[in-house]
């Protein structure tokens, strides 16, 4: 015992990192305390994620995986090994990434959290089951024992369905929709191209693209006049066009080769609807689906009503309801319902019921602690926000009470209202109390204040970052003059940057008004949005912000501008002179490594033209097209201009490494030899310039008027640290949003509305200041801005706030307060208002 105690007393207290050089890290040495919460702060691009994920997670997970067989490792995604001299005393590590993948069509909140597994087990083992003759048998232990059930009414013997038979991704799937809850239906409104055209002139769109041109001749043989405008046909004729029977007709037709001889044959009539249905049945790939999709619309499955379950799976009843009805409940509602399950069963079944229900409730508690009680189990996974998916990921990782694990959290505050962050902090403290260590990368001062130790990276981004500029407790960082986050942690900074617009002037430029009916958990709304102002939509997670703005306002405005029918739940909308609607969201830009910052910002094309005019290029006969790393002669022949090559390593996953020929520059050796000399006498090749960040490239491009102007816009957007050759799919959500804005800056925008969905994702408080300046510049040019946001500094600088709530799910969905930040802070109903003080 004495030896064991002595060993524990001498146990290491910190992870020791020595000589870390991942990405932009400058050979740093740093100690990360064990058994506590450590925050890693710093401006965007300063090296926070490089330290947390590139070093700590890569080493912690890599060493654990090395203990597994090569056969097992081959089937696991592995982080690249860190470029570091030494990492000592690191535990096995789990990482929760900033942007979890968007789930597929078969995923729901219930499947993603595995709550549905527990629910299926309940309905299989504990429910009343229906016999083949329609009689219900009371709950029995025979189901768990694998025995047959006997109907007390008709005496028939049968087996209860297993949990597998209650899965909509397996045997319990609805036969009509295959377990997706949605079916493709023919969109009749898309079948007629133009009612002023005749059928001979191509009025029936599917017959032009999906069917032989002879169908107009067959239609004529069906008794339909094909030489008059479609609108002038009788109802009977239109019925034949849309839904006529598939009968054979003997027709005469003129061959397309110009021959005067008429052909004749027997041909089956395919109505417009049948044409689309026939083409859909034959679809084998995405290309084929694309041809048909313009004539289709998605509708709720008429058989399962969107529940995804088969009729058989919907038959078992527990506490008076079926499994599909249980899935329609929110997490908060079903948690209360599950608590009552054991008491509703016979005495002998209660121990088993308490075990099954207890497991369900433990999983549910972790999710509810993270503020997800408003989500229903049948909510489609693809409709969940980034923050919701990240909290699901966190709940999955922490529900097993492990000890001695290093949890690396990459911006866990994404998408969280200040009130939800309190729940997140509670989960992190629980992890530490179980003997784990937590490292979190974040900018949110509310969550950073919970850390026992903070490591701040910097001082700036990219090549100007990668150093530890400050470390210590929250109080020590707050007093450290070298720290950039310190004043935000201590609260010693001005909150309001821009002047307050008087209440009577808020709507002086106009008003966009929208009325909606109920949808999801959102109640009927009557919203007024001031034109030419910065409006921030706030509220706790699930309060209806996304539904109001992204699912109602945007489709409503687009329909009104196109002169089309409004969506069913959008009752009326007044655009107030708006002609352009631009959604600036955080979806990745581009889908492969060929999309870079320079190409997206329209800088690369201009640089290619400039380099093609250089003396070296003219001597060798190179044109602008030759400088393209996608198709040009000067691209690297080894990697074909991607900058990376993929290695097929036997027994292990494929490994991507920088191209050994161009070292990631994407260009061949000939491109290196063509150098452009600026007015300062500095010479750079295009590959060298593409490897520079925006700030340094600006210094070289001062005499290139158009390039300089476009690079200055990127710098003003706070993207000066990005290299010109950086791949756009790898940018953070916040970086992607600001890059999308680059082409919009400096224009008159009086008729444009910009809608931002949480633009502060990944932004340091200093970067938020830059973003606010961008917002103000757009407003000064006449733009109307609507921002869905949780960041308190953005909310405090709004001209107008629409606060949704008061809670999430069924407890939200209403506009509970509108007005200036001061008015929201004074509102007793507003949860957001509680966190807005101080305002200045």
Regions found by a protein language model. Give the residues of each.
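Conserved phosphate-binding elements of NTP-dependent enzyme cores
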Residues: 1-840
């Amino acid at each position: 015992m004495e030896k064991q105690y002595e060993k524990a007393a001498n146990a290491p207290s910190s992870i020791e990192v020595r000589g870390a050089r991942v990405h932009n890290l400058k050979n740093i040495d740093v100690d990360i305390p064990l058994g506590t919460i450590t925050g890693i702060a710093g401006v965007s691009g300063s090296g926070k994620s490089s330290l947390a994920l590139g070093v700590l997670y890569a080493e912690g997970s890599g060493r654990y995986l090395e203990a597994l067989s090569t056969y097992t490792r081959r089937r696991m995604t592995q982080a690249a090994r860190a470029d570091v001299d030494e990492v000592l005393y690191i535990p096995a590590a789990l990482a929760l990434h900033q942007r979890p993948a968007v789930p597929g069509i078969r995923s729901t909140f219930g499947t993603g959290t595995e709550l549905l597994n527990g629910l299926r087990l309940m309905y299989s083992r504990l429910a009343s089951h229906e016999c083949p003759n329609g009689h219900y048998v009371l709950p029995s232990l025979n189901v768990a024992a694998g025995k047959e059930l006997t109907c007390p009414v008709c005496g028939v013997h049968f087996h209860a369905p297993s949990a597998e038979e209650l899965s909509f991704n397996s045997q319990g799937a609805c036969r009509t929709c295959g377990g997706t809850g949605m079916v493709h239906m023919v969109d009749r409104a898309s079948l007629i191209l133009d009612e002023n055209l005749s059928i001979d002139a191509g009025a029936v769109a599917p017959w032009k693209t999906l069917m032989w041109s002879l169908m107009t001749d067959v239609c004529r043989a069906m008794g339909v006049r094909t030489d008059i405008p479609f609108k002038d046909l009788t109802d009977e004729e239109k019925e034949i066009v849309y839904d006529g029977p598939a009968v054979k007709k003997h027709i005469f037709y003129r061959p397309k080769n110009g021959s005067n001889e008429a052909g004749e044959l027997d041909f089956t009539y395919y109505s417009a609807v049948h044409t689309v249905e026939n083409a859909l049945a034959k679809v084998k790939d995405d290309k084929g689906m694309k041809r048909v999709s313009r004539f289709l619309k998605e509708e709720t499955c008429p058989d399962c009503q969107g529940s995804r379950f088969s009729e058989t799976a919907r038959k078992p009843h527990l506490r008076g309801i079926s499994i599909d009805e249980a899935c329609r409940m929110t997490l908060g509602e079903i948690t209360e319902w599950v608590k009552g399950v054991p008491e509703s069963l016979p005495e002998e079944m209660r121990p088993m019921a308490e075990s099954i229900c207890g497991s369900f409730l433990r999983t549910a508690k972790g999710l509810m602690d993270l503020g997800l009680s408003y989500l229903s189990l049948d909510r489609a996974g693809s409709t969940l926000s980034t923050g919701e998916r990240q909290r699901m990921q966190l709940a999955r990782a922490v529900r097993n009470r492990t000890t001695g694990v290093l949890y690396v959290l990459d911006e866990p505050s994404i998408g969280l209202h200040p009130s939800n962050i309190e729940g997140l902090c509670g989960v992190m403290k629980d992890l530490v109390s179980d003997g784990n260590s937590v490292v979190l990368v974040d900018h949110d001062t509310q969550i950073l204040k919970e850390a026992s130790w903070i490591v701040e990276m910097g001082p700036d981004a990219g090549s100007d970052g990668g150093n530890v500029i400050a470390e210590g407790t929250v109080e020590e960082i707050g007093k450290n003059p070298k720290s950039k986050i310190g004043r935000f942690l201590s609260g010693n900074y001005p909150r309001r940057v821009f002047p307050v617009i008087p209440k009577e002037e808020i709507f002086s430029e106009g008003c966009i008004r929208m009325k909606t009916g109920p949808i999801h958990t959102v109640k009927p709304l009557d919203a007024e949005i001031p034109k030419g102002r910065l409006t921030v939509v706030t509220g706790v997670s699930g309060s209806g912000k996304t539904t109001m703005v992204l699912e109602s306002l945007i489709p409503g405005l687009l329909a009104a501008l196109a002169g089309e029918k409004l969506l069913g739940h959008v009752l009326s909308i007044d655009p107030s002179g708006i002609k352009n609607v631009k959604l600036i969201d955080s979806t990745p830009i581009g889908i492969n490594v060929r999309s870079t910052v320079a190409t997206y910002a329209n800088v690369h094309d201009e640089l290619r033209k400039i380099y093609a005019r250089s003396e070296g290029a003219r001597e060798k006969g190179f044109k602008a097209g030759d400088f393209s790393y996608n198709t040009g002669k000067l691209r690297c022949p080894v990697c074909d201009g991607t900058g990376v090559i993929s290695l097929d390593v036997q027994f292990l996953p494929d490994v991507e490494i920088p191209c050994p020929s161009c070292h990631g520059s994407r260009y061949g050796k000939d491109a290196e030899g063509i150098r452009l000399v600026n007015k300062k006498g500095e010479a750079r090749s295009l590959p060298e310039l593409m490897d520079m960040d925006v700030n340094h490239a600006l210094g070289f491009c001062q005499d290139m008027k158009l390039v300089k102007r476009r690079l200055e816009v990127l710098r003003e957007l706070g993207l000066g640290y990005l290299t010109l050759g950086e791949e756009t799919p790898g940018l953070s959500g916040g970086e992607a949003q600001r890059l999308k804005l680059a082409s919009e800056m400096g224009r008159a925008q009086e008729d444009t509305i910009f809608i931002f969905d949480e633009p502060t994702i990944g932004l340091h408080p200093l970067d938020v200041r830059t973003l606010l300046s961008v917002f103000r510049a757009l407003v000064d040019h006449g733009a109307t801005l609507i921002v869905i946001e949780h960041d308190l500094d953005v909310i405090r600088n709004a001209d107008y706030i629409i606060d949704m709530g008061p809670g999430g799910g069924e407890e939200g969905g209403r506009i509970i307060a509108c007005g200036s930040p001061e008015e929201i802070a004074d509102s007793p109903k507003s949860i957001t208002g509680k966190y807005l003080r101080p305002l200045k």
